[in-house]
Amino acid sequence: AWSPEHSRPAYSDPFELFADAADIIRAEAAELARLGCTYIQIDSPDFGTLVDPENRALREGLGISTERTLTEGVDIINSVADVPGVTFGLHICKGNYESKWIATGGYEFTAGKVFSRSTNFDVFLLEYDDERSGSFEPLAEVPDDKVVVLGLVSSKLPEIEPADELIARIDEAARYVGKER
């Protein structure tokens, strides 16, 4: 992670660090493809935490622009997924370390830019395991050629949600993106 205190001597602009990290990840993805890997999932909690105004303010206070993250940052991540022969998934979560989350809010704030700019990704894996995830309406912004994986089962609870509740949530999501996707 970029830190104004520790990173500035090497990276005056946080997006320079992000671009260098993406170069490393892209090289690793190419090597995995060369070895026969056909699916790579990139975890991008930054996009998930931007749904929360408090997290946006925190990042802005560190000098990491929300607007640049949703444009240049998405483009940087998208460049990682430009390896032929590999299906790429983009996992957008809101944090889950030791069953603790770090952001609350729906995807309305980020959906338009993240989904439309992530052209090299084939699959979006989205956290929807409780009410703080917001409505399914932002799924309407997922391009037609993309697959959506709904994270409906919570890893934060000791018990699995009842099947009828999960089916009802799938049916609700299907109002915005077809079940076949």
Q: Whereabouts are the PLM-identified features?
A:
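Domain-level signal for soluble alpha/beta catalytic cores
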Residues: 1-181
